[in-house]
Amino acid sequence: MDDREDLVYQAKLAEQAERYDEMVESMKKVAGMDVELTVEERNLLSVAYKNVIGARRASWRIISSIEQKEENKGGEDKLKMIREYRQMVETELKLICCDILDVLDKHLIPAANTGESKVFYYKMKGDYHRYLAEFATGNDRKEAAENSLVAYKAASDIAMTELPPTHPIRLGLALNFSVFYYEILNSPDRACRLAKAAFDDAIAELDTLSEESYKDSTLIMQLLRDNLTLWTSDMQGDGEEQNKEALQDVEDENQ
């Protein structure tokens, strides 16, 4: 059995070398020890999976965009190749999502003892079911969306009672949960309500903000406000379709 400290160091080396698949493997072994992860370990695990999934999500969006343009042109010969390529990326996305969801359900959530870590892991569970919902269709999409909603709600229930409104993990949860309402459930009204409530609650308690989380919290508050501005203009018909995909997951790396 690998030593925990060695595995963490291997993960840090892999991160520096930008070899995120190996970073995932090291942190999966730590998670498999069924112990409460430290904040540093938790963040290493999150960053590892986020980079592995992020590259594929970006690829999927580009391929889907090319597919759409080709559909408009009516280029059937190329469409078959594009669709097969997209499906290959979707298979990779599915494997990564199912992998981390399995680690969360079997190891991380059962071993979590603090409110903070429970919120972090349930939020993560919501995020990866959301990523599945992004490309799934029919019943698969419905199931992924329902699983995501349940996980985000579980995280929210704990966050509301155990974390202050200015806590970066609580704010990050509100950010991602509101994106879920907007993008997956097509409910801009609920997305705006959630984001606005989180922003207003944090503003009201800004004086309680600890020095170490000030930068993280204010950054996420800015993102909440940016999303609100974008969504409000979209609802009024002013905004053109914009891809703000990069906004919602920024908080994971710094907590």
Swiss-Prot record:
Subunit note = Homodimer. Heterodimerizes with YWHAZ. Interacts with PKA-phosphorylated AANAT. Interacts with ABL1 (phosphorylated form); the interaction retains it in the cytoplasm. Interacts with ARHGEF28. Interacts with BEX3. Weakly interacts with CDKN1B. Interacts with the 'Thr-369' phosphorylated form of DAPK2. Interacts with DENND1A. Interacts with GAB2. Interacts with phosphorylated GRB10. Interacts with KSR1. Interacts with NDEL1. Interacts with PI4KB, TBC1D22A and TBC1D22B. Interacts with the phosphorylated (by AKT1) form of SRPK2. Interacts with TIAM2.
| Gene3D superfamilies named among the record's database cross-references | 14-3-3 domain
What is this protein's function? Answer: Adapter protein implicated in the regulation of a large spectrum of both general and specialized signaling pathways. Binds to a large number of partners, usually by recognition of a phosphoserine or phosphothreonine motif. Binding generally results in the modulation of the activity of the binding partner. Positively regulates phosphorylated protein HSF1 nuclear export to the cytoplasm. Plays a positive role in the antiviral signaling pathway upstream of TBK1 via interaction with RIGI.
Q: Where is this cross-link: Glycyl lysine isopeptide (Lys-Gly) (interchain with G-Cter in SUMO2)?
A: 50
Which Pfam family, an example, fits this chain?
14-3-3
Question: Where does this protein have coiled-coil stretches?
Answer: none
The cellular component terms of Gene Ontology attached to this UniProt record, alphabetical and capped at eight, are: cytoplasm; cytosol; endoplasmic reticulum; extracellular exosome; focal adhesion; melanosome; membrane; mitochondrial membrane
List modified residues, type Phosphotyrosine: 131
Task: State the species of origin.
Answer: Homo sapiens (Human)
Q: Which InterPro entries match?
A: 14-3-3 (IPR000308), 14-3-3_CS (IPR023409), 14-3-3_dom_sf (IPR036815), 14-3-3_domain (IPR023410)
The Swiss-Prot or TrEMBL record describes its family as follows: Belongs to the 14-3-3 family.
Residues bearing Phosphoserine are: 65, 210
Q: Where is the chain membrane-spanning?
A: none
Q: List-wise, which residues carry Phosphothreonine?
A: 137, 232
Domain of life, per the record?
Answer: Eukaryota
Positions of the record's site feature: (Microbial infection) Cleavage? 236-237
The primary site where this protein sits is nucleus
Where N-acetylmethionine occurs, the residues are 1
List the protein's name: 14-3-3 protein epsilon
